[in-house]
Amino acid sequence: MKRESGNRRIGLKFCLLGMIFSTGIALSASHYTDLRRSEPIHGDPAAGAAKAVVCFACHGAGGNSIAPNFPRLAGQRPDYLYHRLRSFKSASASDPYYSKSPMTALAAPLTDGAMRDLAAFFSSQPPTAAAATHAGPEVEKGSELFHAGDAARGIPPCQGCHGADANGSSTRTGQYRAYPSLRGQYAAYVVGRLTSFRDGRPHNTTNDMIMGGVAHSLDDASIQAIAAWLNSLAPAQAF
């Protein structure tokens, strides 16, 4: 019975992804960077270290942010970091979301090589543990949603793309390399990102498009619970 239930949840996930890719991308391909066949990102961590000093003001030394509204970058997957930087760099000045982000102006002058070096540097940095701010039933509910989803509400399990340990998929191919590790990330940042996906704010990659479909059925309580569970985990080691 347990395996049958698990198969239904996995089936829900792939059904959802199939619908997204068979409709949205076909209709809006020009608006999205297709990561499904993306090549691995390589850069020079030493060169990235020199470029990263300006990033420390918000993201902390080595990418270990001390402010919960700024994401922790240390130990993050390089492919994810690179494609996020590309999204900021390519954003339109008239975009109501990206035009308000300080990252848009900071990324604008970066060359492709610089973005690769920055991604390589931050991914190589050892993450420090952030103080968990949640515990109890909310964390347990977040773990349940992350691992099992909620078929009745059309929510697939997050682990299908982000891995059972929230450290990213072990597949490490194509789009899966660009899914971020979420372990130990600040709850406030995760809440902001999931809310943004749910509310249909700007998405720039096919992975973003998937997240828009996944987050569509999440209510505020579910978002808070998932963020609380992720925040309770020890961060992953550097890549």
Regions found by a protein language model. Give the residues of each.
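N-terminal export/targeting leaders of redox proteins
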Residues: 1-43, 86, 231-239
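Electrostatic cytochrome c docking/interface patches
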Residues: 28-52, 66-67, 124-154, 235-239
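The feature marks the first
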Residues: 32-91, 188
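Sequence context surrounding c-type heme c attachment/ligation sites in exported
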Residues: 46-56, 74, 78, 147-159, ...
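The canonical Cys-X-X-Cys-His
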Residues: 55-62, 118, 155-166, 226, ...
